[in-house]
């Protein structure tokens, strides 16, 4: 693998520079004196911002963008081998790195590289850690998978002491990283188009733990089945958090909710009350996300007052139980949930939010996930009062598994719940306008483009 010398900046070209993660990495390299160019299929606010920062951005992509002065090419997993720039770079014999490989090398510049991993909660917990470090004026560099309002995007270029990064397991991306601290929030079945089964996923997270140096730190949830497995072959420091104070260094008690579902709780350290924490985001799941953030930042020597301030300041990221507005007295929430556990967590948050009936407008994400977690999806969605299903969002897949949203609709109805399947957004919007009433809570849910339904209703 090509090794970047950060003391000798070179010209790096990004294929697909308009992506939220790629654009952030480009900004970090620009701040370190590198010459950066890139291309994408279309212009966007992100590419315009990069141009303003001094980056040469070409639209559309073409072989001619691979010029003789380029020293290294970076590409994402989404780039197909027949992409004209990918082919041209290969033919020119240029060194090439994936996005994950580049991110891993960038981490080596920082004294503390904090990676937040898990099937669920990565974006939120990465944001919580970031908000705490910002509250403590520790000038972190941040790479998060959502829009964090306090930094005006998904990336913040800070000093060289702290790099906070969301670490995704898909295609084993996080195995290219170079962490000094890893947080593992949970390990569940997901991305089964890549992983064989839950054992394969667990093995990947174990390898992720083994990336830590002997003086590194693992922060892990004791609610994960056989959590000791992940660090049995490492000699790094282990700090635990979870629901059981008997086996967790960090836990919570006396959890209470305000009128918007936001939690206040007693922080327990080694079973003893240490402080009272108030969160700025709703949901029981965020209590446990915050415990991980507290464990990480206390290890980084942040005092409790700054920890409490950071957690209170954090009001959420885009598409994580995000209030969009109201129409006809109906409150519209948008959420990225696309896994049964995430759906349950979102509906748990909704239970503490003022509402008459809870509507979920769900767009399943990928055929493989829908097929493999079919019964779990039906069970999770059955906890809503009313369910509307959109077509499956294919993403990177084609329909070869014989599964549809209509099948899921029938399964939900067999559980005694009201559910309809409507195959286009326009008719979904008409149905909701006709059937939602004053005081209802409407949640658009999924990792695709279902958020457009809520936005259209609010126009």
Curated annotation (Swiss-Prot):
GO cellular component terms, A-Z: cytoplasm
Compartments where located: Cytoplasm
Pfam family, one: Mur_ligase
Catalytic activity: UDP-N-acetyl-alpha-D-muramate + L-alanine + ATP = UDP-N-acetyl-alpha-D-muramoyl-L-alanine + ADP + phosphate + H(+)
Coiled coil stretches, renumbered: none
Pathway, per record: Cell wall biogenesis; peptidoglycan biosynthesis
InterPro entries cross-referenced by the UniProt entry: Mur-like_cat_sf (IPR036565), Mur_ligase_C (IPR004101), Mur_ligase_C_dom_sf (IPR036615), Mur_ligase_cen (IPR013221), Mur_ligase_N (IPR000713), MurCDEF_pg_biosynth (IPR050061), UDP-N-AcMur_Ala_ligase_MurC (IPR005758)
Alphabetical list of Gene3D superfamilies matching this protein: Mur ligase, C-terminal domain, Mur-like, catalytic domain, NAD(P)-binding Rossmann-like Domain
Known EC number: 6.3.2.8
UniProt keyword list: ATP-binding, Cell cycle, Cell division, Cell shape, Cell wall biogenesis/degradation, Cytoplasm, Ligase, Nucleotide-binding, Peptidoglycan synthesis
Positions of ATP binding: 118-124
Function description: Cell wall formation.
Protein name as it appears in the record: UDP-N-acetylmuramate--L-alanine ligase
Origin species: Lachnospira eligens (strain ATCC 27750 / DSM 3376 / VPI C15-48 / C15-B4)
Gene: murC
């Amino acid at each position: 693998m090509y090794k970047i010398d950060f003391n000798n900046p070179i010209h790096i070209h990004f294929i697909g520079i308009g992506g939220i993660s790629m654009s952030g990495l480009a900004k970090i390299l620009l701040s370190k004196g590198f010459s950066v160019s890139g291309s994408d299929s279309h212009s966007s606010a992100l590419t315009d911002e990069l141009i303003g920062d001094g980056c040469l951005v070409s639209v559309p992509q073409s072989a001619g963008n691979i010029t003789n002065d380029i020293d290294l090419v970076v590409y994402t997993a989404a780039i197909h081998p027949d992409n004209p720039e990918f082919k041209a770079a290969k033919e020119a014999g240029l060194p090439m790195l994936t996005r994950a490989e580049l991110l891993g090398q960038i981490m080596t510049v920082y004294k503390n590289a904090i990676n937040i991993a898990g099937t669920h909660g990565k974006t939120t917990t990465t944001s919580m850690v970031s908000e705490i470090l910002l509250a403590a004026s520790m000038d972190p560099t941040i790479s998060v998978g959502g829009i964090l309002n306090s930094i005006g995007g998904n990336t913040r270029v800070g000093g060289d002491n702290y790099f906070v990064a969301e670490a995704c397991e898909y295609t084993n991306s996080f195995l290219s990283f170079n962490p000094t601290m890893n947080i593992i929030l949970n390990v569940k079945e997901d991305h089964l188009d890549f992983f064989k089964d839950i054992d394969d996923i667990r093995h990947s997270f174990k390898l992720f733990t083994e990336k830590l140096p002997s003086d590194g730190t693992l922060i892990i949830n004791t609610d994960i089945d056989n959590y000791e497995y992940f660090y049995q072959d490492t000699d790094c420091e282990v700090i635990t958090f979870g629901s059981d104070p008997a086996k967790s260094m960090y836990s919570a008690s006396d959890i209470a909710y305000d009128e918007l579902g936001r939690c206040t709780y007693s922080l327990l350290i080694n079973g003893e009350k240490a402080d009272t924490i108030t969160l700025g985001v709703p949901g029981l799941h965020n209590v446990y996300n915050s415990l991980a953030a507290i464990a990480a930042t206390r290890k980084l020597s942040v005092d409790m007052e700054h920890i409490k301030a950071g957690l209170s300041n954090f009001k959420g990221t885009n598409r994580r139980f995000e209030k969009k507005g109201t129409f006809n007295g109906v409150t519209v929430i948008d959420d990225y949930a696309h896994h049964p556990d995430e759906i349950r967590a979102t509906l748990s948050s909704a239970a503490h939010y003022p509402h008459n009936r809870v509507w979920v407008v769900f767009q399943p994400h990928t055929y493989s996930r829908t097929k493999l977690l079919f019964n779990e999806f039906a069970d999770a969605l059955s906890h809503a009062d009313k369910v509307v299903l959109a077509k499956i969002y294919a993403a990177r897949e084609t329909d070869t598994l014989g599964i549809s949203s209509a099948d899921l609709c029938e399964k939900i109805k067999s559980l005694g719940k009201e559910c309809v399947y409507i195959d286009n957004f326009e008719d979904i919007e008409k149905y909701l306008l006709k059937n939602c009433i004053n005081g209802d809570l409407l949640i658009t849910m999924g990792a695709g483009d279902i958020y457009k339904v809520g936005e259209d209703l609010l126009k």
